[in-house]
Amino acid sequence: MTISRDKTPASPTAKWLTVVGIGADGLAGLSDRARAAIAGADHVFGGTRHLALAARLIEGAAVPWPSPFDPGMAAVLARRGQPVCVLASGDPMWHGVGVTLARHVAADEMVVIPAPSAFSLAAARLTWPLAEVATLSLHGRALAHLWPHLAPGRKLLALTSDGAGPAAIANYLTALGLGHATLTVLEDLGGPAERVRQRPAANFDLGSVHDLNLVAIEFTTAATAAILPAAPGLPDDWFAHDGQLTKRELRALTLSALHPTAGQRLWD
């Protein structure tokens, strides 16, 4: 299904859409403004977990997100001008549904009421300065997205898709030669089943992990690990090739001279 990206407002004053961030603590963490938005909506869209958390406040129709997601987005946009509420995890504008909605709905049509993000809660539990931490969502994404963020001394917070995610991260890091990396698994942050556990990647024996989890990664040395360098010139043996490969030194000099920026591509 194709979704229109038209952001023409329904009327000059209509803020018909409210996106409410809700944490694992449910109603207890909601402001009066958020509660009023949920109770006053004709339709409340959200995941089944979010709808269950807010069930006592919902007076209109509770609409679970379908799979795939696009028909649900189309259903929200079809109600333009009506009071609609969308429930999201934590901060809707941080790897959340609010980002997708903002591509289709003008800022003067919507209100976003965030809750603390999983990253904020994790940084608080670990007392890590969030401004100095790399953050990444692996929800529905390959583990290879971790690779560019891995560096000695760098702290990384990775949001996973489910309870199998932390063990998969541990195996991936071990395969890169980072079995000594410390993994801290933070589960159900802000909820009744909150738990924080720590293991080295090579000896990851936590067993069952809550589906709502985030993994903190840190290591100080990586002498023999496959870490992406910050400067151009990747090792020759990192490429699949038939022997016809521009040598590392020439690649490094060429890239340095061209100084490419994000989004540019050189075909050698």
Explain the meaning of each model-derived region.
Residues R103-M110, T127-E132, L176-A181:
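A short alpha->loop->secondary-structure connector
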